[in-house]
Amino acid sequence: MQDIQLDKRLSELLSQAVTPQNAQPLMQALCQSLNEHNIRYYVDDAPSITDSEYDRLMQRLKQLEAEYPQFVAADSPTQRVGGMALAKFEQITHLKPMLSLDNAFDEADFSAFHKRVSDRVGEVSFCCEPKLDGLAVSILYRNGVLERAATRGDGTVGEDITENVKTIKSIPLKLRGDNYPELVEVRGEAFMPKAAFEALNERARLKDEKLFVNPRNAAAGSLRQLDSKITASRALSFYAYALGVVEPTSHELAKTHYEQLQQLKSWGLPVSSEIKVCDELSQVFAYYQDILTRRADLPFEIDGVVMKVNDIAQQQTLGFVAKSPRWAIAYKFPAQEEMTLLEGVDFQVGRTGAVTPVARLKPVFVGGVTVSNATLHNADEIERLGVMVGDTVIIRRAGDVIPQIVAIVPERRPEDAKAIAFPQHCPVCGSLVERLEGEAVTRCSGGLFCEAQRKEAIKHFASRKALDIDGMGDKIVEQLIDKELVQSPADLFKLTASMMTMLDRMGMKSATNLAQAIEAAKTTTLPRFLYALGIREVGEATAANLATHFGSLEALRVATIEQLIQVEDIGEVVAQHVAHFFAQPHNLEVIDALITAGVNWPTIAAPSADEQPLKGQTWVLTGTLNQLNRNDAKAQLQALGAKVAGSVSKNTDCLVAGEAAGSKLAKAQELGVKVIGEDELLALLANS
């Protein structure tokens, strides 16, 4: 109740015009709110607002303090770094304060920072690095041996997490070599990689335990475990980003920040491979855009990039203000999480009959776009979140990922909030819905009787990766079904140009072009045909593996589950889906109707070992290929027996690097994976 009253009071004050009379109570309310959110974020590991909303409140307080300096409070969050040491850990006073960074939110902000710096010290270069979304850590080495580790805490006093830090495998217990100082403090970020975060939450989900909202909370919670065995099980990582205290001070250190990071690396400390020195302002902005573009593909969460004056002498000249260095700034990305209101829930039916709840949201700008809908996945997810209509929810949108609700803000729940009821009947056709034992998804039982499944199945059949009917977009498919011109995939091949002129905004010329595209699509490949059928969990790669293994549709139709499991990358679940599909009479009728309509493909000869020289190898494609379509390259590699993966790992045999290859290339080089260019790939394909 106190939280609700605090938010209500703050909202009332923020809605008023600021005057000398009400400025002080507004600033006090902002301080109180921000300090409360600091405790939730740093102490409880349970934030109730997003980073972007916190930033907005902080910016508002800074503006007011600049305008009314006489009202600046001693407990204002602008007067300290932020965060508190937990009493349950031994408290450690830092040998040198661990300060935070000022923020830039756009090019104008950074340009102003650049001008302030260059006005003081002249021409500058910047060492640029990703701003990891984890927990700042100080690690003290004495005579090369890890002696102590602490959190940043409030910047002056932190928490002793030595035993927990020792469990992070990427942190050396003893420095490499012998050219390090007698005493050296290493500062960096402890974080949880995305893959480790997903695995941690999956384990929690199976045990019906509370899930972490994001990797940052998971990392913070893991480092604050009293039992270091729990920390050890959490697969944390660490990147060093600066030197702290060094004794003796006479020890020779590198003269630039970038070179000091390389020194740290030479001592055995992990340093990000994404660090780059930029000499021009335009290079800084290009670096920012490059990292922003690749943000979703990076193996760790970041919320911006950090720009530091590279020359150490210039850093010393610039010095510090009360809570941050003058020589560094965090250039923040657009927020990936925002808070908004859940106004209602709709239920959509997909091509496989899956009934998916979709949240209707009060529109909010997040991840670079305005979001008004978000997936709720299934009934289990609704129950896990405890979400109700009317709740204030936290929305996350990362890269091209569909926006989703990751948490609710329980203290903002209104009294008239309504529970979300899953329908008992299909919202499209009225058929009963069913949920099979062991499955999370609820499905409509109507099959092709259900218009939604019919529409989505035919859209999928005509899509680019399936039969690739040029010009057959979603809206045209919907019209064809609405006007009862098409009831099944085979009906597409009965369409004539004159029939399609019945569609909205479809003249004879466009109809003729579409009719020709339909005719051309009759000649396809067996992998595309199998993918087009929409068999559950059979994507492009699985369809290609099935076609390669069995060689013909006839052989696949009669394959047993035991035979299907022999196919590369097919387990028992997918094998059951495939066998079940071909056991259904109505599916066989659809296939026969398509073949009768003239759909055909060249015969695939069962490959010999000589024809699959890449069998057992894992390949990855990255960058832009100029002479070969990415999907064609993937298909040809698969035909040679290769598995084509989406990410580089120690199990990768070869990376094909096209133009503008980014993090995958760097990862491959780091792991010693073989790298070839497009010309070498073309030569390989030509000779195989």
From Swiss-Prot:
Protein name (record): DNA ligase
A GO term for molecular function: DNA ligase (NAD+) activity
Annotated binding of NAD(+), by residue: 51-55, 100-101, 129, 152, 189, 308, 332
EC numbers for this chain = 6.5.1.2
- Binding-site positions, Zn(2+): 426, 429, 444, 450
Give the SMART domains listed for this entry.
BRCT, HhH1, LIGANc
What family name appears in the similarity comment?
A: Belongs to the NAD-dependent DNA ligase family. LigA subfamily.
Task: Give the protein's function.
Answer: DNA ligase that catalyzes the formation of phosphodiester linkages between 5'-phosphoryl and 3'-hydroxyl groups in double-stranded DNA using NAD as a coenzyme and as the energy source for the reaction. It is essential for DNA replication and repair of damaged DNA.
Reaction catalysed by this chain?
NAD(+) + (deoxyribonucleotide)n-3'-hydroxyl + 5'-phospho-(deoxyribonucleotide)m = (deoxyribonucleotide)n+m + AMP + beta-nicotinamide D-nucleotide
- Name its GO BP terms in alphabetical order: DNA repair; DNA replication
Q: Which top class of enzyme applies to this chain? A: ligase
- Domain BRCT: start-end pairs: 609-688
The cellular component terms of Gene Ontology attached to this UniProt record, alphabetical and capped at eight, are: cytosol
Q: Which cofactor does it need?
A: Mg(2+); Mn(2+)
Name the domain of life this protein comes from: Bacteria
Q: Which Pfam families does this one have?
A: BRCT, DNA_ligase_aden, DNA_ligase_OB, DNA_ligase_ZBD, HHH_2
Active site location: 131
What keyword terms does UniProt attach to this protein? DNA damage, DNA repair, DNA replication, Ligase, Magnesium, Manganese, Metal-binding, NAD, Zinc
